[in-house]
Structure formats: C-alpha cells, structure tokens
Amino acid sequence: MAAQTLYDKLWESHVVRTDPDGTSLLYIDRHLVHEVTSPQAFEGLKLAGRKPWRVHSIVATADHNTPTDNWDLGIAGIKDPVSRLQVETLDANVRETGALAYFPFMDRNQGIVHVVGPEQGATLPGMTVVCGDSHTSTHGAFAALAHGIGTSEVEHVMATQCLTAKKSKAMLVRVEGELQAGVTAKDIALAVIGRIGTAGGTGYAIEFAGSAIRGLSMEGRMTLCNMAIEAGARSGLVAVDQVTLDYVKGRPFAPTAEQWEAAVACWRELKSDEGAVFDAVVELDATTIAPQVTWGTSPEMVVAITDRVPDPAAEADPVKREGMQRALAYMGLTAGTPMAEIAVDKVFVGSCTNSRIEDLREAAAVVRGRRKADSVRLAMVVPGSGNVKAEAEAEGLDKIFVAAGFEWREPGCSMCLAMNADRLEPGERCASTSNRNFEGRQGQGGRTHLVSPAMAAAAAIAGHFVDIRKGY
C-alpha cells in the first residue's frame, strides 16, 4: 500500500461509498450540538416524522447566547428574547430526543462546545466530528477529522449519521525549532495565516507537524487547529503521540481497561506514513516567530509586535491595497505606527481559541502582582467551561485576576462574537484572544486585535500592546 497521510487514513476509514463524481458519503462518529444552529434541524426532523438516528453520537451544550454574569437570575438573565428562546429550545429538544451528554445553561459542565467536547473525552482520536460551527476544526488536535457544517447538514447528520463531502487536498505545515519564551501556539497560528493568507488553505486539510508542534500541549494544539479555518482550510490535524494519550486517558467518555488498550493500539497509527506525499508543504522556523498582533480586519492582516502598521502604498496589488486602506480606516490606524504604541480600551481573554486552563495560567502569570491600566475600561476573563473555571479557582487564578482589576466571568462564548451581552461599543479597541477580527465581529464598530492570552494580559496592564518577551 502506498504511504498515506493522516488525512488519507481518517477519510478512508469513514467512507461509506464514493460516487463517480468524487462525492463521498462519510460516516460521522460524533455530533456536537449547540443552541444556535440546532433548532431548525430538530424542527426539520419533527416535520418529517424522524428522530435522531444515533442519539448517543450527540453531545450538546449552550454556549453562544449564554450570559457570563448575572447567573443568579437564571434563564431570565438572558435579556435578548431570541437568544433566550434558542437556549430554551435546545433544552426542550435534547430532553425530548436524548443525547450521549447534555450540559444545559448553568450546569457545572456547561461551556463552549469546543472546550467541553475534548475535556469530557467525547472527542477521541480517529473520529469524524462535526458541529454547526466553523471552529469545529479545533478537534483535529486529537487526530480527529473535524469540520463545521451548516444547519441543513446538522439535520442531515441527525437523520442519517452520514454526510456527503468531497475529499480535500492535504497540506503539511511543518514548524521546526524551539519557540522563544512568551511565544505560543496562537502566535504560530497567526504567523501561518500571515504567511499563506486566509485563502491559502482553501480546499485543504492542514496537518501541523514538526518539533515545535510536538512540543505543544493539547491546549496549544487545539488553539492551532481552531485557527486552521482562518487560513481557509476545511480541517486542521495533529498526529497522535503520548501527549494526546495522556490528555484523553481517564476522561468521562474515554474508553477504559481493555477497551483503552485496544484503542491506543489503533490510535498510535494515526500519523502520516514516512514518505507520504502532500499536495502542498509550508515550512516555518519556530525560533523566528515573534508575538503576533493583527492590525486589520482579517486574521491575515498580522505582524510581529516589533513591527509597524503596514503602509498600503507599498502594496503592488491594487485589490489588496484597497483592502488595506479600508481596514486602516475601519480600525482608526495610521500606516507606520509602531504596534507597541497602539492603545486598547478593552481586553478579552476567552473564546474557543484561548479559554482553557493553560491559557488562563499564561494570562495570570503576566498580571500577578500588577494592576490593570486606568485607561483600560474593561479587562475580562471568561473560562471556556465550568470545569475550567473550577480548576482555575482551585489554583487561585480568579483571585489573581480580580486583584489586578479584571472581571472574572462565568463560561460561554462571550465577546468572541456580538451574539450575547458581552460586546464592544462603536470605536472601542480590544486586545482579544479570539479567532476573528472582522468588521463588527465583537460589536458594531468595534475594533479587534487578535493576540495570545499573555499578550492580551500584558496589554491590559500597560494600556497598549507590548512585547511579552520584555519584562513580562
């Protein structure tokens, strides 16, 4: 047999059939469900007189619309009636149909679906994982074939446990070398996107490999795969190694005893074979990656903290030049401004990209013994799940943040997107650990700069972006 990539192995092990035009029917192992993209799917099933084909594939939680404060008010704390209805509808639907696991609003295990799935052991190596959310690529950190689907596809998976798709091309992103102190997986992700652009991965499944990737924790690998979609890729992947196995073992839905041993024997094969051929290869030197900060309205508009805001006049492509000019106008920035001189109004540490325990530890290490700058109106930390929150509080991280003038919130998607009460006001500038800096993403007229948790925390203390490698 010819040498296979990890993507080849995952794809071929789930193909039910392939039509002459190349369209395949894929079996889906795990279906993650939240309140925003599931109501129409459940309603479609009811209208057709169907029920979910395999309810034990479903893991559900409320995350996008849930408030991160005023939990004492219960469901009434969700002020927007549409948001409240979506949360209530998810609750009614899942209680009626059943699921492998359901973590409703205010449950101790509730949180962002892409944090909850892995921490519960519901995401396992070798699985196909789908969710009505674009950042489902997160789960590829476990060598799972994971990608987002649309609302109609959510219904299709519920009804048939299968999905039609065409095989992507395979891209290898190899990152070799040791990262500098203060440089994280978020910086790798932004550096990759800065290199290949937001369309560079279109039509590909990206496998991340190399010594720098092997040196990442599972939290770091999830951050990296989470951002693969921002490079245009369908999926992000990291091969199984001992780090993967150590993370999964003992989690609530992970196999045990003899089943664990059998699973591990299979999982250890989830890596690209020696000599496997990729359709594209991108190589980065980890030692040269500096802390990254986005300056525009796309993740590809990113530079090192030591750089300046780019000048559109230096861009030869007229389309790109116009895009840069529009971005600078929206962001209220002037070409040539040092990134370290850009002041921020708000700081957000959270989202499915950077709200896990490692992320909070990194941010807390920066703010310990310091105080938020008076010029920063709000600095908020939103754990990715109730379990992350409990673990952080057991370590005293909440007290570190509160002592520094930060707000310590309840779990949820929060300020990643303007779909709940946490949002920017027009003109406000935010250092954010989320994944998208589009116009209006965090609130109409809001200006988003994507950074790592440590960089966000440092900006809150200084009142502007700083090089985390110097004095923090």
Swiss-Prot record:
Keyword list (alphabetical) reads: 4Fe-4S, Amino-acid biosynthesis, Branched-chain amino acid biosynthesis, Iron, Iron-sulfur, Leucine biosynthesis, Lyase, Metal-binding
Single GO term (MF): 4 iron, 4 sulfur cluster binding
This chain's function reads:
Catalyzes the isomerization between 2-isopropylmalate and 3-isopropylmalate, via the formation of 2-isopropylmaleate.
Query: What is the name listed in the Swiss-Prot or TrEMBL entry for this protein?
Result: 3-isopropylmalate dehydratase large subunit
Cofactor: record remark: Binds 1 [4Fe-4S] cluster per subunit.
InterPro entries named among the record's database cross-references: 3-IsopropMal_deHydase_lsu, Acnase/IPM_dHydase_lsu_aba_1/3, Acoase/IPM_deHydtase_lsu_aba, Aconitase_4Fe-4S_BS, Aconitase_4Fe-4S_dom, IPM_dehydratase_rel_enz, IPMI_cat
- Record pathway: Amino-acid biosynthesis; L-leucine biosynthesis; L-leucine from 3-methyl-2-oxobutanoate: step 2/4
Provide the family line.
Answer: Belongs to the aconitase/IPM isomerase family. LeuC type 1 subfamily.
Needed cofactors, names only, are: [4Fe-4S] cluster
Identify the EC number(s). 4.2.1.33
**Cited NCBIfam families:** leuC, PRK05478.1, PRK12466.1
Q: What is the lineage of its organism?
A: Bacteria, Pseudomonadati, Pseudomonadota, Betaproteobacteria, Neisseriales
Pfam families, alphabetized? Aconitase
